[in-house]
Amino acid sequence: AGAAVATASYAPDYAPDVDIRGVVATGVPYFSPAALVALNESRPPDQPDPMLAYNFLAMTLAEQIEPGFLMREYVSDEAWPIVSMVTNACHKEMRARTETAELSYNRAFKQTPSDVLGRVFAQMGFPDMRIAAPIFLGTGARDRDTPQHMQAAFMRDACAAGTVVGAHLYTELDHKQVVPGSTGESLTFVQAVFAGDAIKGNCDASPLG
């Protein structure tokens, strides 16, 4: 979803000859400062948190772009045997190992990497929230990877920039389930944009809050 939005955002400058009619984004990540604050507040630091796998992966990027940053200086001795595998493991494996070890934020880190990660996540943002093509935004209310409030922040900022966004909330679905679970509505959207139909969106009545 993030790649789909980023492609549409970069396209006018990078590939203006590409005719992008619409964007389907189910479970879109959004790393604005406000969204990151809300995300962190929803994750108690003293409770097991499999989402830490994303933090570990982001820290490998920090080592590449932040002079002097060393992951080992932030990760606890207890968590290091797991975290050190991140350079050779995919997210699925890291998440499973993090979950099995019941790592919490407090147990994983001996000093917080929040400032560094904030700068890293800023590099994962979209260059322009004003996107010419309309967006189908599918959100699972049970999504923990890209939670509803994160996607709501994306919608607010995209709508404020003038992007047409049509949001759909699926109350019983999580991050993985929302892709197939939204197919009926997303296919209708795709057919409409290829037919040249006007897409109104629901910026004024978002179901995401």
Regions found by a protein language model. Name each.
Residues 1-2, 28-32, 141-145, 172-177:
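Solvent-exposed loop/turn segments at secondary-structure junctions
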Residues 18-22, 131-134, 161-166:
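Loop/turn elements at helix/coil->beta-strand transitions in domains of secreted/extracellular proteins
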Residues 26-126:
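Accessory cap/linker subdomain of secreted extracellular hydrolases
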Residues 37, 109, 113-114, 118-119, ...:
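C-terminal catalytic histidine-bearing segment of alpha/beta-hydrolase fold enzymes
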